[in-house]
Curated annotation (Swiss-Prot):
UniProt keyword annotation of Phosphoprotein present: no
Binding site for heme b b566: 97, 196
Record key words, sorted: Electron transport, Heme, Iron, Membrane, Metal-binding, Mitochondrion, Mitochondrion inner membrane, Respiratory chain, Transmembrane, Transmembrane helix, Transport, Ubiquinone
Family matches, as Pfam families: Cytochrom_B_C (PF00032), Cytochrome_B (PF00033)
Any GO molecular function: ubiquinol-cytochrome-c reductase activity
Location(s), subcellular: Mitochondrion inner membrane
Organism: Cryptotis magna (Big Mexican small-eared shrew)
Cofactor(s) this protein cannot do without: heme b
Gene Ontology terms describing biological process: mitochondrial electron transport, ubiquinol to cytochrome c
Subunit and interaction comment: The cytochrome bc1 complex contains 11 subunits: 3 respiratory subunits (MT-CYB, CYC1 and UQCRFS1), 2 core proteins (UQCRC1 and UQCRC2) and 6 low-molecular weight proteins (UQCRH/QCR6, UQCRB/QCR7, UQCRQ/QCR8, UQCR10/QCR9, UQCR11/QCR10 and a cleavage product of UQCRFS1). This cytochrome bc1 complex then forms a dimer.
Cofactor binding note: Binds 2 heme b groups non-covalently.
Name of this chain's protein: Cytochrome b
Amino acid sequence: MTNIRKTHPLMKIINNSFIDLPAPSNISSWWNFGSLLGVCLIIQILTGLFLAMHYTSDTMTAFSSVTHICRDVNYGWLIRYLHANGASMFFICLFMHVGRGLYYGSYMFMETWNIGVLLLFAVMATAFMGYVLPWGQMSFWGATVITNLLSAIPYIGSDLVQWIWGGFSVDKATLTRFFAFHFILPFVITALAGVHLLFLHETGSNNPSGLSSDADKIPFHPYYTIKDILGVLLLFLVLTCLVLFSPDLLGDPDNYTPANPLNTPPHIKPEWYFLFAYAILRSIPNKLGGVLALVLSILILAFIPLLHTSKQRSMMFWPLSQCLFWILVADLLTLTWIGGQPVEHPFIIIGQLASILYFLLLLVMMPITSLLENNLLKW
């Protein structure tokens, strides 16, 4: 008799995705981040659901409701900090996952990659709206500054901003709609992640060598289920340490002050995972130019497959490309640091140079280096 997991309509989908899935025999720990992102998403949805049971999306009571969660709700402080630091872990895994894709040429799976870029935008939008909900100083002013960027759009800009605000400033209507969107978007992200997997399983996973692994496949279970569980345990270890020992390490002290439209904080900055994009935005003196650079800093990922000039898929055997990749990583860390600094000398010029280098590396230097490496091997 055939096994039920291979015949039952629902079990069959699970079986073909997580049990009998043929996987390359040589994928490294860099391939763990996909499953870790799935775990992060589940953690965020569950903790978010329990927070939503106690949170009120009203300007008068939002800040107090978060305080109430932390002080009066059973393990409310734990749920709140798991959710806040879970977002940080989510983005760490996201950056690693995207970095892996860039390094090993996973972007050659066009559909999977483009849905991944869409997922990145959706997660960033969700995180931004979530940061507004506690209604602290940085929540309010972050929302004001970032939504105001849309006013740079010619002709319709100011109308668009007021439409998003639901009034003439960030107020009750804005908070309510941000809560609604923040609640619904994770489910959209879950659906998109399903489509992401669907397209991935059409082609099968890439591997570090970038060569076809059709001749040497192993079943996903037990080999990669065990490997993924190890990754999940390490993720839990880091998240637990963060939540229990220094829950406010990655937050902003200004957000413990209730929102006050009459008092602007000295340094308005987003959460750490947006600082690189914020630094690129600030490095251009023109408002519209800055907004375009901000969007392009992420959207550029969608053009990476078109800029692939190498005769090999992966960077594994290309020392020059590897060198440029790690310069790009260092550049992004520099931008992250600059994004958190005040707008003054020497941070302005460092930010501008790092922004130029970021676009130069991705658009010019990496494709040219790949062509050079092809010629070195007389390909």
